[in-house]
Every structure is written in structure tokens, then in C-alpha cells.
Amino acid sequence: MTVNLSTANEFIARHIGPRQGDEQAMLNSLGFDSLEALSASVIPESIKGTSVLELGHGLSEAQALASIKAIAARNQLFKTYIGQGYYNCHTPSPILRNLLENPAWYTAYTPYQPEISQGRLEALLNFQTLISDLSGLPIANASLLDEGTAAAEAMTFCKRLSKNKGSHAFFASQHCHPQTLDVLRTRAEPLGINVVVGDERKLTDVSPFFGALLQYPASNGDLFDYRELTERFHAANALVAVAADLLALTLLTPPGEFGADVAIGSAQRFGVPLGFGGPHAAYFATRDAFKRDMPGRLVGVSVDRFGKPALRLAMQTREQHIRREKATSNICTAQVLLANIASMYAVYHGPKGLTQIAQRIHQLTAILAKGLVQLGLTVEQESFFDTLSLHTAGRTAALHDKARAQGINLRVIDAERLGLSLDETTTQADVETLWSLLADGKPAPDFAALAAAVTSGIPAALARQSAILSHPVFNRYHSETELMRYLRKLADKDLALDRTMIPLGSCTMKLNAASEMIPITWAEFGALHPFAPAEQSAGYQQLTTELEAMLCAATGYDAVSLQPNAGSQGEYAGLLAIRAYHQSRGDERRDICLIPSSAHGTNPATANMAGMRVVVTACDARGNVDIEDLRAKAIEHREHLAALMITYPSTHGVFEEGIREICGIIHDNGGQVYIDGANMNAMVGLCAPGKFGGDVSHLNLHKTFCIPHGGGGPGVGPIGVKSHLAPFLPGHAALENKKGAVCAAPFGSASILPITWMYISMMGGAGLKRASQLAILNANYISRRLEEHYPVLYTGSNGLVAHECILDLRPLKDSSGISVDDVAKRLIDFGFHAPTMSFPVAGTLMIEPTESESKEELDRFCDAMIRIREEIRAVENGALDKDDNPLKNAPHTAAELVGEWSHPYSREQAVYPVASLVEGKYWPPVGRVDNVFGDRNLVCACPSIESYQDA
């Protein structure tokens, strides 16, 4: 008997949905006898053979977990007092288990379909309420990428809104976190903004500035009263942004109360691990008058078609996918999973618990300071929250060495001073250890005596007087039982990958395997400070080095930066690399970016941020780039041509055959080619952008490489470049290349990189290629099954699509009055998340099934779409009323079902249109949400829900 003793490649069948027999049946329906034959037909001749991925074996799940455990063990976990915007904290176990580790939360998509997203929308509304309450500003968004990028967004926000229109200078306090200042400088330079860093206490003339950024408390620990300075800036028509510590705001006068126009910062210390720098949720709050200029997403209260309160993403017309190069920001994701952790941390602890945590940290800091003075050390701060700077003169270097020998990290400031930041995890024993470390032989202070005598380090003028978190949601769920049930109740309202396929085109909602997710909650990855000494992060260095090599192999590029913490940031970093390359050659005049008309709105928004002028090129009737129009515009602008941004496979879901020619045209006219990697899931192992003409691409690790979407973030958007662009990859103060940071931490959202490392390691090169082939097979199977019911808008010359297909519903709108929205909402009644609506073409649905979906699930979706087409036909021929029909009224709720029924169609047709739903039915918690009402009556914080329910 021959038994296969190898466990190699066992994961591939776990990741890929179709079984072997089903795979062959799908191939037969397309007229192919093998995956290789299908691939050969889909991939254009001009780019065949460009893949450089070695088709090796994948590790078993057990082997991969053992390997990454060994890597994690190389990280050294010291007791860290570095601070600087990153603080250790406790993630409450019920939040860890019921939210962070729960696929109902982490596999969900951005809540663009509000009827199936009420749970996480409520959690995000809690987050917005938390931020609004603590900051003292009425409007807060649903999170941004990190504190550094939030500060950069605040700077450009001030530039747009300041009445000091002639100014191009932005004042940034020298007391801001250094990494924030670095991100500001990167963002400012292409926009012609001059960032002036200085000591706000010595600022005499504020008239040159359109805005200012102040840190509260200061990075070194000082607490300044900014009231008078804020008034001076306002008198000069400048806006004031304040980077504020969220936990400190439970004790401090909030920025909104001393006149700030914007408050930004990080919610990391609300239960989110350090994670070597990320991912963490940043926040952004502002005045009501400025809400339409605020970057990022905003959850608002509206009503459904029954008049019942319902939540939705508000004011989306201000976002980049609508406004393109006129957008206020290129941000198209948030940090929803992390914002929801912070939200639930506040819900669990409540106002009293949060205040107690802050008071304990502050009290320990005050006791520590008193003891240090007793020991003869000079503490620079007279007022503080949790951070102290010590003047240690010639002892500084020796003290750092002594501390590290004891497993302690202190903050490195300069040769004369060091810093200490306490946090939620600090204890009395820790304070006594610090005294011992710094005592220089002197007897230790008496902790109890100092604790009895110590006074607050917060001046009375800065002590918070206003109440926080009075809404019932922050005052109810303080037992674990209550919180567990609240999280379950919210999760049950939503549709995520744990229940159903999410066939969103251009979003790649594939499996996020449990084995890939397990390492992210290990302390070896989660408890490391991003600015810990390099020798303590050997595991992360190995992980990132190996992952960069893996991504180079998958793309054909020569170098990779993992720093960008979203696809939008990757785009931005890629265009900055192109810009810097041209400048290094004396080609400063090259500032034209060609972008096809079909491009995602992020592309032109990013080009604008990178200081480039956008020239739009045409597409032909098949949806491909019009090569002759591209050639004409490249020649017309050849003296100023910087770049082409193009998505491949195309935004229309097709492998364009002219891609090599397109790249050649740009290169011949002095430009660089940016290939947007949003659709990389169709290419891995089959062709490589770095080998068929791309100079730079960003990848979406949250699409192609299995990092979950988290309900709207986190994402990771690394960029791959050819060797000539490698010197211009993002730098960071903690790296060898110090310049060009695009986010606050050197490796961005480092703690979720193990997910991609695990995926690639378990799939191996052969598995990655097979995943691409199955993604193409699944998309073409759906396209073929549905083409006789709905026109497939674009195909290649062979009649095939890439990894997604676009169904054209516009003729049905004309014949029946049924819109793409009606079909999307009707799919909810069948238990499906809708495909991507009206992108890249209005009135269409773009479907991307990914390789992870089984034939059964594909058939279930196709059956639903075919049944919906039959319902549309019934509207067309008059069998169903054109206004009162299952599509116009979708989705149908349980409350409607048991209420008085007045529709001319049956209850059964409404909620059980196919028999399989009887076995397991998803019930939407609300009916169709009224978008217009929500924007006209904008409410973005919690109290209104109660008032609406009482009304």
C-alpha cells in the first residue's frame, strides 16, 4: 500500500472552494479541458511567461504556525516606557474573543450596504460619539489610518478652509511627536506647503500661517494651556488642529472647549496592542460647519422605508470615488476593526472606568516624578499627564544601557535627557523598579508616603469640567455577560464572509483562514513598540525581509516597501517615488499624470496629492484604454509626462491585450508606469507587472494576500518597484533611509503582516498560481451562467473575463424601471451581499467571486440572480406591479412579514423566494435606508438613536 506521507500543499484545498469534480464541470461549461488551457486563453500573448514565481510546495498549517512561532520568538519583549504616541494597554478578553477573533467582525466589508451592516455601523457610531465627547467637537469620523496621516489630513483640511488664502505656511509645534512631523513634511512638499516647526511659546507673529498643529499633552510630557495661542491664530484667519491623547482627555479640558477647529490623534491605547506600530485607529473631529470637508467616512443616522431609525455612511458624495482629482483626500478606507475595538473598550469600561484608568496612570506618574526629584534628578515638567522628561546629563547613555540590561526601554531624547511614559499596564512595582534604576545608589523613596502626599500634575485651568459618555450605551454593558451579548447582537445584524459569499468586484473578498489569523494576537508580535531598539525586533526584521522577497517574487519587482498602511497610501508612495526619481534626474517639469477615464477615483485624487496634473485618456467601446488617444496625449505632453496610472487587469475586469504597448508608449515619452495592483488576484503566478512594463505597483494585502477587510479596515498597501525607483521608497526615522515617511510607523500595520506571510507560505508558488486560475475560472463560470439573463458588459477578444465580470442592468432600468439598487437590495432577501454597484460603469453590477467560493455557493448566487431576472420580467410584462413589487420593496424585514400585509405579492415570495432559504434565513434588521433623509438631517453621534426610538 502506498501512502502519501507528505503534508505539503494540504492547505491549498482548504483555501480553494471548488472540489476537483466541480472544477472540471465548470471548465467543461466553458469549453476547456484544463485550468492551463483556460489560463492560456485568458492571458494575452504579449505577457505570457512573465511570471517569475517559483512553483514550490506550500507548508502545512502546522508547519507554517511552527515556523512563524520561531520567527516571533526572536522578538524581545521589554518593559517599555517609550511612549511617543504608542502605549501598552490591556485588550479586554471578551473583546479579544468576541470581536477581534470573531470572523463575523473581521471578515465583513465596508458598510456601503447599510441594511446588512447595522451592527458594525452602530459600533462605529459609538466610536464617533466617544471621539466627539472626549474631544469636545461635534463631528467625528469613523477613523483614519494613523495619527501621522490624520495630522497630514488636518494640515490640508486647514489649507482648504483657512481664510488666510495667501499663506502657504503651516506651523507645527516642536512638541509634536517626531514621526508626525516627518509625515507632515512628506505630505506638504508636493503641495507647496512650508511646514514651519518651532516652539509655540516663543511664537510672536502668527500672521504668516494658514493653520497650526499643537500636541496636547506635548510629546515630551508638558501640558500647555493653548487658549490664548488659539485666539491669536483665529485672529489671523488661521485654523488650529490639536493632536490630543484620547485617554488624557478624560481628565483634561477638551480641545473643542479651548477653541480648536480640529482634533486628531490615535485610539490605540483604548485596548489595541502596540503591534510594532499598527494597525491602530486614528480619529479626526471638527466643528459642524466643516463637516463636508472632513476626510474619511462618517456614520450618520437616517430612517428606513418604515420610518424606523437606521444607520448609514453619510455624505459619500464628498469622497474620492465621486470627486476624483477634486477630492479632499485619497483615503478610501478606515480602520474599522480597530475603531470598533476602541469603541467597545469605552463601552466596557464606561466613563467611570476610563477616568479611573487615566487617574491611576496620572497618579503613578505624579508619584514617580516626586520620587525622582527626591533622588536628586531634574524632572523638566511642572505639569503633565503620563510622560516625564529627565535631565540626566552625562549619565544618559549609561542609564539606557543599564535599563536595557534589566529588560527596560526608556525613551531616547538626546545625549542629555531621557523620557518615561507610563500606561495602563504600569504598576507600583514598576515605579519602584524605575526609582531603583535611576537612584544612582541613593535609598529608594517610600511609595506609600509619596502616594499619600502627592498632588495632581494637571493645572486646575486644564482640568476637565464637562461630563463624558453620558449615553446609555457607555453605561450599560459593564459585565462580561452583557458585553458578550451586545457584541453577539450587533454581529447578528450583519452579513459577513462567515455567512455568505461577498461577490464585490475589485474587492477580492476571499477566505481569511484561521491559521493565518492566529499569530496576530500573539504577544511576540503585539507587544513590541515600533521605536524599540532594533536588536529587540529581530523577528519582525526576519518577517519583513522574507515577506518583501515573497512579494518581489509574486510581482516581478526588485524591491518592496511594506510601510503604506492602505492601498491609497501605497498609491501615494508610488507616485512620490516617481516624482522623486524625475527630480533626481533634473526633470522637475515632469508633472503630468495620464489616467484612463475608467480608473477608480483614488487614482486622480492621489495624483493631485502628489503634486501632479491629471490628464484623462479615453477608453474604447470594449472598455479598454484607447491606445491611439493615449499615444496622442503622451506625445502632446512628452516634455511634462511624469506617469501613467493604469489598473491591470483593467477596472472592467479584462486582460487588455495592449498592455505592453501601452507601457512602451509611456516609456518612449519619458514617463513611468504605475500599475494599480487592486486586481493582482488574477495575475499571481500567471504574469508579473514588474516584467511586462510596470515601474511601480501597489498591492492590496487585504485583497490578494488574505488580510481581512475588518468591516472597512485595516488594509496594507505595500509597493513594489523596479530597481531604479528603489532609492525613492518611503523612509522613516527608525530606518536607514530617514526621509519620505508616508505613515507614522516604519513598517505601517506591521502586526497583521504575519497573515500574508502565512498565506504565501502555506500556498507555495504552485498554490498561488492555482488560486489565480480558480479566481479566473469562478468568474468566468458566473459570467457564462448569467450571460443569457444579463448582458456581460466587457470581455476579452476570446469572450472571457479575468477574475471579475460586469453585468449591465441599464437596459432593465429602461424596460422595467428596476434599478441596480433594487437588484442589490433584493439580493439581501436571498441572503447575499450585493456585488459592486455602478463602478466602474453606472447602472452595472461588478461580480468577483474569488477562488475561495465553492461551486455550490456560485450556483446559489447565480440561481438568485436568475430568479431576480424572472421577477424583473414579471414587472416588464405586468404580472408584478411596477412600483409595489419585491424588488422595489427589498429588503423585507421580519417585522414587515408579521405585520399587516398589503402588497400584491405573497409573503413567501418576499422572504423565501427560493426553497433553500427555509434552512437558513438572514433577516435584515431594517428596511431600505433613506439616503437623502440621512444627509439632510445629519446626526453622527449616539443620543439621537434613543430620541428617534422615543419619537
Swiss-Prot record:
Task: Report the residues modified as N6-(pyridoxal phosphate)lysine.
Answer: 703
Which UniProt keywords are present, listed alphabetically?
Oxidoreductase, Pyridoxal phosphate
* InterPro entries, per the entry: GcvP, GDC-P_C, GDC-P_N, GDC_P, PyrdxlP-dep_Trfase, PyrdxlP-dep_Trfase_major, PyrdxlP-dep_Trfase_small
The GO biological-process annotations, alphabetized, read as: glycine decarboxylation via glycine cleavage system
* Catalytic reaction equation(s): N(6)-[(R)-lipoyl]-L-lysyl-[glycine-cleavage complex H protein] + glycine + H(+) = N(6)-[(R)-S(8)-aminomethyldihydrolipoyl]-L-lysyl-[glycine-cleavage complex H protein] + CO2
Q: Which GO terms describe its molecular function?
A: glycine binding; glycine dehydrogenase (decarboxylating) activity; pyridoxal phosphate binding
Q: What class of enzyme is it?
A: oxidoreductase
Q: Which cofactor does it need?
A: pyridoxal 5'-phosphate
Cite the EC number. Answer: 1.4.4.2
| Cellular compartments per GO CC | cytosol; glycine cleavage complex
What function is annotated for this protein? The glycine cleavage system catalyzes the degradation of glycine. The P protein binds the alpha-amino group of glycine through its pyridoxal phosphate cofactor; CO(2) is released and the remaining methylamine moiety is then transferred to the lipoamide cofactor of the H protein.
- Provide the assembly information: The glycine cleavage system is composed of four proteins: P, T, L and H.
**Similarity field:** Belongs to the GcvP family.
This chain's protein is named Glycine dehydrogenase (decarboxylating) 1
Q: Which organism's genome codes for this protein?
A: Pseudomonas fluorescens (strain ATCC BAA-477 / NRRL B-23932 / Pf-5)
